[in-house]
Amino acid sequence: MSAKKLEGSSAPANRRDPYEVLCVSKDANDQEIKSAYRKLALKYHPDKNANNPDASELFKEVAFSYSILSDPEKRRHYDNAGFEALDADGMDMEIDLSNLGTVNTMFAALFSKLGVPIKTTVSANVLEEAMNGTVTVRPLPIGTSVSGKVEKQCAHFFGVTISEQQAESGVVVRVTSTAQSKFKLLYFEQDSSGGYGLALQEEREKTGKVTSAGMYFLHFQVYRMDTTVNALAAAKDPESAFFKRLEGLQPCEVSELKAGTHIFAVYGDNFFKTASYTIEALCAKTYEDTTEKLKEIEAQILRKRNELRQFETEYRKALARFQEVTNRYTQEKQTVDELLKQRDTIHSTFSVVKTPSGNNLSNGSSSKAQGDESKGDGDSAGEEGGTENRDKSKRKWFNLNLKGSDKKLG
């Protein structure tokens, strides 16, 4: 079961043009799309429209449209071929856990535990409070860390103030959880009204015995890994999962920060319990060697991704050739076995001794029977002749003796 089958996550039955839904132009930039989405999501959120049955469907439509236009790859596919291209790619939706009932949340938690990739959105309540500027922001000085626990579908906000020198050197903000909690690391930009709009978000990933997420503002392109892409590729074609392993690599939108105070937040993404975390802000000046290593490894991974794309083509050709040769081997083996069998059958026909078939006897069998019969007759005749000769011998012997005896007596 995929995430898009859960309540509040399925695509609208009658799909409208995403640009039309969000009221933006075809050439709208990312910021314009984000701003339009935030306004419409807050306007149609079901929690704020309990008496409006149409609001829930409109909210789904807005979320569905944003999921397309906020993703560069999906947006490109849609611009080229419409919804058909997205359907072919098996696009998944994100779900808002705060909009799910207890039963659906339990199902989501179960399937997530089984390894099904389920994307979640930030609660509309959190986004609204941030936009209204009513959130509590705690200071997080560079070079320090803060630990805490955040309730599910809630967020803890932190203000990171950086100097000109620190901004030039680069800044890193990371969150880890030794309890392996699910969370999101959020980055907000301040708008003209004094509120905060969501600009970036990073999903936690399991790395070793902890879960972690980070944002790296180091003045060069840094990438995030979307493991959902890998999971979906593995589900579609397990044999090609390896080749898609680096396809989830996506560029981070912001690569540097200006001097000033920047707002980050840790969002609790567990299904039921609180999320434990430690957030820290670092200046890259003291991690120059590590920064260079990261820059180098990112470049190597990008090259390897291109190499894998080419190698997959070669592998597919070789695999097809191997399958072809294997099939021919089986066919050739069967042909050779059949030819040798026919050869043996032909050899066996060169013989006067043939296998009986039904009630008909072969010539060889008849000759043999007649020969045996003749042999039997000869044996009987021989036995009779021998008896007569023995009788004659006896008579002759007795006659000789008798004649001799008569002479002597006489």
Swiss-Prot record:
GO cellular component: cytoskeleton; endoplasmic reticulum membrane; Golgi membrane
Keywords: Chaperone, Coiled coil, Cytoplasm, Cytoskeleton, Endoplasmic reticulum, Golgi apparatus, Membrane
One of the GO BP terms on file: positive gravitropism
Compartment(s): Cytoplasm, Cytoskeleton; Endoplasmic reticulum membrane; Golgi apparatus membrane
Region called Disordered, residue ranges: 351-410
Consequences of knocking out this gene: Roots and hypocotyls reorient slowly upon gravistimulation. Plants are normal for phototropism and for responses to hormones such as auxin, abscisic acid, gibberellins and ethylene. They also accumulate starch like the wild-type. In response to gravistimulation arg1-2 lacks cytoplasmic pH changes in columella cells and has a bad repartition of auxin that accumulates in root tips instead of forming a gradient.
Pfam family, one: DnaJ
Chief location category: cytoplasm
Domain J: from-to ranges: 17-82
Transmembrane segments: none
Domain of life the protein comes from: Eukaryota
Coiled coil ranges: 284-344
Residue spans of biased composition, Low complexity class: 357-367
An annotated Gene Ontology molecular function: cytoskeletal protein binding
Organs and tissues of expression: Expressed at high levels in root cap, root tip meristematic region and elongation zones, and at lower levels in mature part of roots (at protein level). Constitutively expressed in seedlings, etiolated or not, roots, rosette leaves, cauline leaves, stems, flowers, siliques and pollen.
Membrane topology note: Peripheral membrane protein
PANTHER family (alphabetical): DNAJ DOMAIN (PROKARYOTIC HEAT SHOCK PROTEIN), J DOMAIN-CONTAINING PROTEIN
Function: Plays a continuous role in plant development probably in the structural organization of compartments. Seems to be involved in early gravitropic signal transduction within the gravity-perceiving cells (statocytes), where it influences pH changes and auxin distribution. Probably affects the localization and/or activity of auxin efflux carrier components (PIN proteins) or other proteins involved in lateral auxin transport.
Annotated family: Belongs to the DnaJ family. B/II subfamily.
Protein name: Chaperone protein dnaJ 15
Species of origin: Arabidopsis thaliana (Mouse-ear cress)
High-level lineage: Eukaryota, Viridiplantae, Streptophyta, Embryophyta, Tracheophyta
